[in-house]
């Protein structure tokens, strides 16, 4: 197994999290860190760790050839020794030492791609509550669609592919103008979506460092939304209808609340919240979501809808400069 981490100016995160990846209980694996023209001490951190871990490999890209992560990812894949690739990020750490084992146990000849889950670390702030809820919402959507053999995206913080999938991907072979979303476009370019499976074992989850200020979070989400406009039309339609239906629910409720149908509106609203709370509770239990999200999810959903509207508009016109 080849674990690949693309890093750009990630010295602090690598010093915190990389050893969680290196200390996995797996018979034979390598960890490849591709230093994408960093200007901090990323390479020095890796070289120091190499003294203790023979499985750790460093590839340094001296000059920035592209604003996207694609060149770094390509370089890592082509340099890998094994037939399967497990992706994660510098700011991530597996929750257990069995991460590689559990993810790889889902692989088969007919299922060469495994989508994992990567929740964010919890901290008591409203931004973090938004991040926690949005991550849960996104995971329910992309994991459930993958189970239906209709996958449309993956999370590069925790995803496994056969090396052949990378080499055969049009996104891997050809340059595009996108600066992010290489993981998503790999799924979009797969002809047989039945070859994708998921891992819901909690010990296969990978914790990720969340943004702690609104500006950084907004910039990160804009990159994600920019990629979504390049999904297949059917996937864009599905996501569009999902968000529009949620927005219509809240707008309709507010309009009817100040009409002569306010009693009916309140009844339907309460029943809907109850049913959704049950399902969100089930999803949260499976995906180990933070408990505060369960208590205030209606507030978070309403706020997130407004934020997603702005992100959707911004993602349509935003010109990205770099993957970081």
Per-segment meaning from a language model:
Residues 1-2, 30:
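Cell-envelope/extracellular polymer assembly enzymes that use nucleotide-activated donors
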Residues 10-23:
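Short, well-formed alpha-helical segments that are part of the catalytic scaffolds
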Residues 41, 90-105:
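Acidic donor-binding/catalytic loop of UDP-sugar-dependent glycosyltransferases
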Residues 62-80, 102:
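Glycine-rich, basic loop-to-helix element that forms the pyrophosphate-binding segment
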Residues 85:
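Short aromatic/hydrophobic "clamp" motif used to bind/position activated sugar donors
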Residues 107, 113-138, 164-167, 171-236:
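Catalytic donor/gating beta->alpha subdomain of glycosyltransferases that bind UDP-sugars
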